[in-house]
A protein has these predicted regions:
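Auxiliary Fe-S-binding modules of radical SAM enzymes
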Residues: 1-86, 92, 237-246, 253-356
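Short linear Ser/Thr-Pro motifs
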Residues: 68, 102-103, 185, 208
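Generic beta-strand structural signal
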Residues: 74, 86, 97-100, 109, ...
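Residue-level structural signal for beta-strand termini and adjacent loop
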Residues: 90-91, 163
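Canonical Radical SAM [4Fe-4S] cluster-binding loop centered on the CxxxCxxC motif
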Residues: 92-129
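Conserved alpha-helical substructure of the radical SAM core
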Residues: 118-148
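Conserved AdoMet/S-adenosylmethionine-binding subsite of the radical SAM
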Residues: 137-314
């Protein structure tokens, strides 16, 4: 049988046939409100806990856990029941605690600068496999409360649409997380954006844009050959109209590719009619894409240029680069030894070993 997090409340009740009805609420509270492992739900009899743990083992087995940024960023590599692997990242800020979850093992989108896309697609994740990433992160972040969940890990969330929406609804309804603190990132699956707009969830949508020029974007994000910038803009406009929510564009700044004055003008012209906020991300290094990221000076100049052109823009505070946990770096492999960079130089990374 699968993880308990695969089950709805009704399915959970069915698994407790023969038990008093109040056991369902005790178990549900332990799992969804208190983030406990089933063996830790001490309101249940020991024999029942042992049976449930045996029948519904965890979906995730941690095979590596590394910490950076002075303990503020944690990355896990998890093995799934069939040997597929995924990565999850927990980031603690002064004002929030965020987990970045994977929605697929690998990714079929093939974005040239993304380590996940370079690695290829393995399979879709299930609802329970995604939710357990959230629960593991919530336990690790305690006593601080997990406040935000972002679908910015491995995979294209809207290519695993039903699971993504199922997870969003359960986080909102069962964990009582504000939908505004749930973010879905997409490379631009236009029909799915329009479908998501009709779900009635006032979540945050982040579009990985990276170029407002079809020719350039075709190379950076091959999905653009199927849904070009005009089609994507129409979907974004529908999103805004249906939800009343602002959207954001993610833009990984690549030296000489999308940090030029022309790229600046193209982005401003594209973002302004949609009143989109632009998150600028200095390109993070990956083994399969050897072009450099923009210099800090160019990043600041690009941001200032957008603001001068009437576009809201900020530079993302990059976390986890030293442990390959930053945007575009997730590839579900343990590269080198913990505590070392790929080139052998030391970094402030420490292994943790604690039960999940």
């Amino acid at each position: 049988m699968g993880s308990l997090y695969e089950l709805t409340r009704e399915e959970l009740a069915a698994s407790l046939t023969g038990e008093p009805r109040f056991r369902v609420e005790q178990l549900w509270r332990g799992l969804w409100r208190e983030d406990r492992r089933v063996d830790e739900v001490t309101t249940l009899p020991t024999a029942l806990r042992e049976r449930l743990a045996l029948e519904h083992p965890s979906s995730l087995t941690a095979i590596n856990e590394v910490v950076s940024d002075g303990g503020a960023t944690t990355k896990w590599v998890f093995a799934l029941h069939d040997g597929a692997t995924i990565e999850t990242v927990l980031m603690a800020y002064e004002d929030r605690v965020t987990v970045c979850v994977s929605s697929q093992a690998g990714c079929a989108m093939g974005c040239s600068f993304c380590a996940t896309g370079q690695a290829g697609f393995t399979r879709q994740l299930s609802v329970g496999e995604v939710i357990e990433q959230v629960v593991v992160a919530a336990r690790a972040g305690a006593p601080r409360r997990l406040s935000n969940v972002v679908f910015m890990g491995m995979g294209e969330p809207l290519a695993n649409y039903d699971v993504t929406v199922g997870v969003l609804r359960r986080l909102h309804e069962e964990r009582r997380m504000s939908a505004r603190h749930l973010t879905v990132s997409t490379v631009g699956v236009a029909p799915a954006i329009e479908r998501l707009a009709r779900e009635g969830l006032p979540l945050t949508l982040a579009v990985s844009l990276h170029s407002a020029n079809d020719e350039v974007r075709n190379d950076l994000a091959p999905i653009n050959r199927r849904y070009d910038l005009a089609r994507l803009a129409a979907a974004c406009s529908r999103w805004i109209k249906e939800t009343g929510r602002r959207l954001s564009f993610e833009w990984a700044l690549i030296d000489g590719v999308n940090d030029t004055e022309r790229a600046l003008d193209e982005l401003a012209a594209y973002a302004r009619p949609l009143a989109a906020h632009v998150n600028l991300i200095p390109l993070n290094p990956t083994p399969g894409y050897l072009v450099r990221g923009s210099t800090p000076e160019r990043v600041r100049a690009f941001r200032d240029g957008l603001i001068a052109r009437g576009v809201n823009a900020t530079v993302r505070n990059t976390r986890g680069r030293s442990i390959d946990a930053a945007c575009g770096q997730l590839a579900s492999v343990t590269r080198g030894k913990p505590g070392l960079r790929r080139d052998g130089s030391t970094t402030t990374v420490a292994l943790r070993t604690r039960p999940l």
